């Protein structure tokens, strides 16, 4: 999948039976195209984050009102595995996705869930190559545990505030990448 993406960008060329070679784009156009692509990617991520912040503010309130104790326990199990991986530096992408997916489900609103899933799929595409950030969005990971605790306490304002901090960390990574 990664090679296909690089091939589509003209960065590599795949020759059947011969291997993978550096693409044929000229240096000048490559630099300009990279700069334009970087700017568009950054702007798209910022816009997606703005939409996510607005939607998740209400999502948090719905989760606090609608989630069952069983769902909270399941989110707790996901959070525990996620945080263990974060603490030892293991890859945590799958657990991070499970965490957010579970929260989306816990709102018990199928339309809201569907809209959030579309936004989630869009940001996943953008984050395939996240602005050349090494270890992107790691600063946001500790907030997952405190967000879970606030949700479990059913404290809407506290959970919303923590979720905003989580998204602020992601935004900061994107802003730093642009400097």
Regions found by a protein language model. Give the residues of each.
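Conserved amphipathic alpha-helical segments that form helical-bundle/coiled-coil interaction surfaces
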Residues: 48-129, 139-144, 158-173, 177
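Short linear motifs at protein or domain termini
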Residues: 1-54, 61, 65
């Amino acid at each position: 999948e990664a090679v296909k993406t690089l091939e589509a960008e003209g960065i590599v060329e795949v020759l059947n039976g011969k291997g993978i070679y550096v693409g044929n784009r000229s240096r000048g156009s490559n630099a300009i195209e990279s700069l334009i692509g970087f700017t568009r990617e950054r702007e798209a991520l910022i816009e997606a984050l703005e939409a996510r912040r607005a939607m998740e503010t209400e999502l948090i309130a719905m989760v606090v009102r609608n989630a069952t104790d069983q769902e909270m326990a399941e989110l707790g199990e996901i959070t525990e595995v996620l945080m263990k991986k974060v603490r030892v530096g293991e890859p945590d992408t799958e657990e991070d996705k499970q965490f957010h997916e579970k929260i989306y489900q816990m709102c018990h609103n199928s339309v809201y869930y569907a809209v959030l899933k579309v936004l989630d799929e869009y940001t996943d595409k953008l984050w395939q190559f996240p602005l050349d950030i090494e270890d992107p969005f790691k600063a946001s990971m500790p907030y997952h545990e405190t967000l879970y605790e606030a949700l479990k306490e059913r404290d809407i304002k506290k959970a919303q505030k923590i979720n905003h901090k989580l998204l602020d960390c992601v935004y900061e990574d994107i802003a730093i990448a642009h400097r």
